[in-house]
């Protein structure tokens, strides 16, 4: 079935993902309610989102909904089931989905590192300028100021003495 996703949201009681879409055959706006079963405050949001997106009943409807958005909706549901307020859950999701430039990525485990890398890849794709963009300039020339006094680093002066 051909459809265009318009909005995707979550209902807490009873838990369900709600998709508002436009049917391309008749052009009508419709609503699809996909119940969330066997999900608790200890469930993995990524796994639940993948299972819902790959479910044969809902697959054709969720093609245009990103996996990241479904994960976020499941995170809201998990926060609700844990007893957190909506503001607390939003703050927690914001912390998880942003990259701290001062954070040492060498200290993260493999799962967290993969998550951070996927966030960085997504940000790169979003900010990347493509040839078709209206503000795209092919050859940018930048002139750097020429200071008379160049600052040298300690290891530069040490290696210069060796030669």
From Swiss-Prot:
The keyword Cytoplasm applies. Keywords: Cell projection, Cilium, Cilium biogenesis/degradation, Cytoplasm, Cytoskeleton, Obesity. Transmembrane segments: none annotated. InterPro entries: CEP19 (IPR029412). One of its GO terms (cellular component) is ciliary basal body. Its main location: cytoplasm. It comes from the Eukaryota. The keyword Metal-binding does not apply. It is found in: Cytoplasm, Cytoskeleton, Microtubule organizing center, Centrosome, Centriole; Cytoplasm, Cytoskeleton, Spindle pole; Cytoplasm, Cytoskeleton, Cilium basal body. It holds the Pfam family CEP19. GO terms for biological process: cilium assembly; microtubule anchoring at centrosome; vesicle targeting, trans-Golgi to periciliary membrane compartment. Belongs to the CEP19 family. Required for ciliation. Recruits the RABL2B GTPase to the ciliary base to initiate ciliation. After specifically capturing the activated GTP-bound RABL2B, the CEP19-RABL2B complex binds intraflagellar transport (IFT) complex B from the large pool pre-docked at the base of the cilium and thus triggers its entry into the cilia. Involved in the early steps in cilia formation by recruiting the ciliary vesicles (CVs) to the distal end of the mother centriole where they fuse to initiate cilium assembly. Involved in microtubule (MT) anchoring to the centrosomes. Interacts with CEP43; this interaction is required for its localization to the mother centriole. Interacts (via residues 121-150) with RABL2B. Interacts (via C-terminus) with CEP350; this interaction is required for its localization to the mother centriole. It is linked to Morbid obesity and spermatogenic failure: An autosomal recessive morbid obesity syndrome characterized by hypertension, fatty liver disease, insulin resistance, and decreased sperm counts. Variable clinical manifestations are early coronary artery disease with myocardial infarction before 45 years of age, type II diabetes mellitus, and intellectual disability. Morbid obese individuals are defined as having a BMI greater than 40. PANTHER family: CENTROSOMAL PROTEIN OF 19 KDA, CENTROSOMAL PROTEIN OF 19K CEP19. This is Centrosomal protein of 19 kDa. It comes from Homo sapiens (Human).
């Amino acid at each position: 079935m051909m459809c265009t996703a318009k909005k995707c949201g979550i209902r807490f009681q009873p838990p369900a993902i709600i998709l508002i879409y436009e049917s391309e055959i008749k052009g009508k706006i419709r609503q699809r309610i996909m119940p969330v079963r066997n999900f608790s405050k200890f469930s993995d949001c990524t796994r639940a989102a993948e299972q819902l997106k790959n479910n044969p009943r809902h697959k054709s409807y969720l093609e245009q909904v990103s996996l990241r958005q479904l994960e976020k909706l499941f995170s809201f549901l998990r926060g609700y089931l844990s007893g957190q307020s909506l503001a607390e859950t939003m703050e927690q999701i914001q912390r998880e989905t942003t990259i701290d430039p001062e954070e040492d990525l060498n200290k993260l485990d493999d799962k967290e590192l993969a998550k951070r890398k996927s966030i960085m890849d997504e940000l790169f794709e979003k900010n990347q300028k493509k040839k078709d963009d209206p503000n795209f300039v092919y050859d940018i020339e930048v002139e750097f100021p020429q200071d008379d006094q160049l600052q040298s680093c300690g290891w530069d002066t040490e290696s210069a003495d060796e030669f």
